Structures are given as C-alpha cells and as structure tokens.
C-alpha cells in the first residue's frame, strides 16, 4: 500500500466511519496453492468486545468459498471516491499529475458460521437494505420454503480483523492555494471528482 504519513487519518474513528459508509468490499485471498481469488460483497462492520468483526455471506462452493476454507487469511478492500488531479492545477509547474483516492484494507482470518448465524445475517442484510419493515421483500415476508432453499446456496462468514491499513490521499502535501484550486477544479467534474472535493473541504475544517 502507498504508505506515506501525510495521507493517513489521525482519528481512528474516521477510518471506522469510512468502512461503514463504503461497505461493499472486494474480498480477496488465495487458495492453498497460492492462486488468487476475489469476490465483491456487502458486509457489516461491528465492534464486538474490543475487536473489529466483518460479517456477510457468499455463494457456497464458489471458487472463493473453497479457497477461503483452504486458506482463511483474507483481505477486505473498502473503496471510496477517487479522481484524477492535473499538474496544471498546481501553483508550481512540473509537480506531476496524480490521483486522489480513499481506501481501507482490513485483513484477518475468516470463519464460516452455522445455520443459525446464516439466518441472522440474511435477516440483517435484507432488513438493512430494504429499510422498510413493510417491504414485500422483507425477511419476515419470506416463506420458510424459500429461506430454506436460499440458505442451501450460501454460507455466512465472520472475519476477525487483525490489521488495518488505509490511504486517504487528498492533496495534503500541496500548498494552500493549490489545494483550493484542486477543490475548485474537482467541483466541476463528475460525481467521483465532486466527492473528493467534498472530502478535501471537510478535511480542512
């Protein structure tokens, strides 16, 4: 990881908040032979008894499920906004164009849970994203037969996080005028550029 101190958050709560906000992750690992695998899943980020736990579910017997059973060391990559930064936006020339971005890498051991925990994560996931207790797609509206059939195809997991690294690269190494010019230019860009501009404004408050 791009590991420079000026691109690190001073407050660990900001890292946790970022993870919860950007919780559709790339979950990566390797099988026993070292073949890399990855999948993309929504997860929950919880603090339990002083430990950080990531939980979710994946398709049963997929290449990544089988690989994670062989080798439980995994990494969840949390992706945030990102945007191109042009050299022409700096007050001084020849400083090199670059990319601003925000990401967190959380690694640890994955374990697959029992049937009861699977039902709990199914309910939590469905109710969280439906966000409506009266939704016809809510967990409490699912038939027992459907839940039973669905649970045969997936498996729930928990990851006990033992290491977190992050990069919040937001032009912290630029002079004040360049910083403001970068924000102004990004504000004219697409949704990703505008999101980086907002993060840059907030980081200087």
Whereabouts are the PLM-identified features?
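Residue-level recognition of well-ordered beta-strand positions that form the cores
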Residues: 42, 57, 77, 109, ...
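N-acyltransferase acceptor-side catalytic subdomain
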Residues: 3, 20, 68, 158, ...
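C-terminal edge-of-domain segments
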Residues: 113-205
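Short, charged/polar surface micro-motifs in flexible loops or helix N-caps
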Residues: 32-35, 46-53, 60-64, 80-84, ...
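An N-terminal domain-cap segment
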Residues: 1-53
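A generic structural signal for short beta-strands and their flanking turns/coil linkers
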Residues: 23, 39, 50-54, 70-74, ...
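Short, structured beta-strand-loop surface elements
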Residues: 61-121
């Amino acid at each position: 990881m791009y590991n420079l101190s000026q691109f690190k958050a001073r407050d660990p709560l900001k890292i946790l908040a970022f993870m919860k906000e950007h919780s559709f992750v790339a979950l990566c690992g390797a099988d026993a032979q070292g073949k890399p695998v990855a999948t993309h899943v929504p997860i929950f980020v919880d603090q339990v008894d002083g430990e950080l736990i990531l939980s979710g579910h994946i398709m049963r017997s997929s290449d990544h499920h089988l690989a994670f059973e062989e080798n439980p060391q995994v990494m969840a990559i949390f992706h945030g906004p990102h945007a191109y930064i042009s050299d022409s936006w700096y007050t001084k020339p020849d400083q090199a164009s670059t990319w601003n971005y925000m990401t967190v890498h959380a690694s640890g051991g994955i374990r697959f849970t029992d049937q009861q925990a699977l039902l709990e994560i199914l309910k939590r996931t469905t109710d969280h994203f439906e966000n409506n207790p009266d939704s016809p797609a809510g967990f409490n509206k699912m038939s027992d037969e459907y839940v039973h059939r669905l649970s045969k195809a997936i498996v729930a997991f928990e990851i006990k996080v033992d290491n977190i690294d992050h990069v919040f690269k937001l032009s912290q190494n630029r002079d004040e005028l360049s910083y403001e010019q970068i924000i102004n230019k990004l504000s004219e860009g697409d949704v990703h550029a505008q999101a980086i501009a907002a993060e840059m404004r907030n980081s200087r408050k």
